[in-house]
């Protein structure tokens, strides 16, 4: 409807994006780990999608104030330009003030939602969420300062008042507003929908596959996956990593104890292979090595002689696969039965505790730790499961406290404020259950990207709750004796329309993630579009 207002919002959003990258670079200089990665390619689009929401709310509310001013004091003003500078100043100031309070709550919850990415075990997601949170703050700052200033400085378009903003009550607004007369029906329908969603939530699984983080359109990645699929002869081995004076009497004793522990463990298969088993096999064909090993005894010189030889060129030809370059670390490889991620995590925890106890009892300065691809994947998967609970729970608690605090201040009554805050919070939690339920029913898995979908749903969804409840309170103040249907219908017809436009831009921005070459980001975009629609 107005290219000027559209340009104002978009230009300020672009400036905010530039400031975001500048701040990210400054934080990097100050020592904060901010790594640019593939996920950050989508940050400008996401900031545009979310940031336009704030500008949209401000512009829509200012135009609404101008319309109301003409209705309250008819002077034949038919376009936006017909208003005097003073009238525009009053409308811009009032619209900005009324919007900024709700936007402040919205930006805070949005930032909390994206900062919940810091609970993720993936560094690229930590940087991704932090940068977006910084960007949202800059966009909010410009939306309530620079945007009103530009609207005041630049003359408005000769846009007819009736076309500047559609605030007429339509059939959809009337129907939504009438729902306040049948709260029981709304609750029953919500429960009926929530039952299958809760069952789907119970079926939701955690899944993590490193292959999803590779772009298989790149030739070198295709070759890597081909080698992994076609030429891998056995499952990836696990490793016991022994640090300390490996080539010593105590080191040999600890090595034997670790091998015995691995061999006796019912969940391991095959014979563990390490430096000493390799040396025993090689001594039959190497007379010099055989002489050194035959001379091993209680004196340290014999062990030192063997260590010195192992670090020579001939020795490294034998020991390089199991012994590092200064003989201070060795690995013992072994196999374990294929387990699911939870069983693997439990296996790692139990075996690590046993090996740590063996190292402590050895009497020397040794450590023994476990490693291996399957253990890493199990640990990452466990972190994903924990992060889903921690991030969602943290954001839910912060939002509940914030809603209770805001309503307590407005109502000037702790009990009524707590009750209203809790009532506002319940629909948000229902949306989280629905989102996770849909993921479970459709076969989506929680991974390192979708782990924060619950927190983001709460963070962005509370925007709509705050905007609508704030507008409802304004309508109550304007017409305290009116019917609740009138309050809700007017709120939906005005703020509700702006919320719908904001939801469209946000969903459109996140849907762009479907063009990402990374499967997890594609899934994240798809799930979040559903989450935004449900939150609205």
Task: Report each predicted region and the residues it spans.
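Membrane-embedded transmembrane helical bundles of large multi-pass transporters/channels
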Residues: 1-208, 360-536
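Intrinsically disordered, low-complexity regions
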Residues: 77, 173, 177, 211, ...
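Short, contiguous strand/loop micro-motifs
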Residues: 162, 210-211, 246-249
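A generic short-segment signal for beta-strand/edge and adjacent turn/coil regions
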Residues: 176, 182-183, 206-211, 288-303
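Juxtamembrane extracytosolic/periplasmic "stalk" immediately C-terminal to the first targeting helix
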Residues: 211-217
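Structured non-transmembrane domains adjacent to transmembrane bundles in polytopic membrane proteins
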Residues: 217-406, 428
């Amino acid at each position: 409807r107005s290219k000027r207002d559209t340009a104002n919002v978009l230009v300020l959003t672009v400036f905010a994006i530039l400031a975001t990258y500048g701040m990210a670079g400054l934080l990097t200089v100050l020592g904060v780990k901010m790594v640019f990665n593939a996920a950050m390619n989508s940050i400008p689009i996401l900031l545009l999608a979310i940031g336009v929401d704030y500008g949209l709310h401000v512009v829509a509310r200012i135009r609404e104030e101008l319309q109301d001013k003409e209705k309250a004091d008819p002077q034949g003003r038919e376009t936006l330009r017909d208003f005097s500078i003073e009238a525009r100043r009053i409308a811009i100031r009032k619209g900005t003030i009324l919007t900024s309070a709700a936007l402040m709550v919205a930006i805070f919850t949005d930032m909390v939602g994206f900062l919940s990415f810091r609970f993720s075990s993936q560094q690229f997601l930590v940087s991704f969420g932090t940068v977006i949170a910084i960007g949202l703050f800059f966009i909010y700052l410009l939306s309530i300062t620079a945007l009103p200033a530009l609207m005041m400085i630049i003359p408005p378009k000769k846009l007819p008042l009736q076309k500047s903003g559609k605030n007429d009550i339509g059939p959809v607004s009337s129907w939504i507003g009438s729902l306040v007369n049948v709260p029981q029906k709304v609750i029953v329908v919500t429960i009926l929908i929530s039952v299958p969603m809760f069952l789907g939530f119970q079926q939701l699984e955690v899944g993590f596959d490193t292959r999803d983080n590779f772009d298989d359109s790149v030739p070198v990645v295709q070759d890597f996956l081909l080698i992994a699929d076609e030429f891998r002869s056995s499952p990836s081995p696990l490793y016991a990593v022994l640090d300390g004076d490996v080539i010593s009497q105590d080191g040999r004793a600890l090595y034997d104890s670790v091998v015995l522990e691995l061999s006796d463990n019912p969940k391991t298969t095959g014979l563990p292979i390490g430096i000493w088993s390799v040396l025993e096999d090689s001594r039959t064909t190497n007379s010099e090595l055989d002489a050194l090993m035959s001379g091993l005894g209680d004196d340290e010189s014999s062990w030192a002689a063997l260590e010195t030889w192992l670090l020579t060129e001939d020795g490294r030809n034998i020991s390089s696969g199991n012994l590092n370059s200064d003989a201070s670390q060795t690995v013992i490889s072994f196999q374990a039965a294929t387990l699911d991620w939870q069983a693997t995590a439990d296996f790692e925890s139990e075996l690590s505790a046993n090996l740590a106890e063996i190292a402590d009892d050895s009497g020397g300065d040794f450590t023994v730790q476990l490693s291996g691809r399957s253990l890493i994947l199990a640990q990452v998967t466990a972190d994903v499961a924990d992060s889903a609970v921690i991030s969602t729970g943290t954001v839910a608690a912060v939002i509940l406290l914030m809603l209770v605090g805001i309503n307590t201040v407005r109502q000037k009554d702790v009990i009524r404020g707590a009750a209203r805050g809790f009532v506002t919070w319940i629909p948000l939690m229902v949306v989280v259950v629905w989102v996770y339920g849909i993921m479970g029913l459709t076969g989506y898995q929680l991974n390192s990207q979708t782990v924060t979908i619950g927190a983001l749903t709460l963070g962005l969804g509370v925007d709509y709750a705050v905007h609508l409840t704030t507008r409802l309170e304004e309508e109550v103040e304007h017409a305290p004796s009116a019917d609740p249907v009138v309050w809700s219908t007017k709120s939906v017809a005005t703020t509700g329309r702006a919320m719908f436009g904001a939801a469209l831009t946000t969903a459109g921005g996140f849907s762009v993630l479907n063009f990402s070459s990374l499967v997890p980001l594609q899934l994240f975009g798809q799930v979040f579009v559903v989450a935004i629609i449900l939150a609205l």
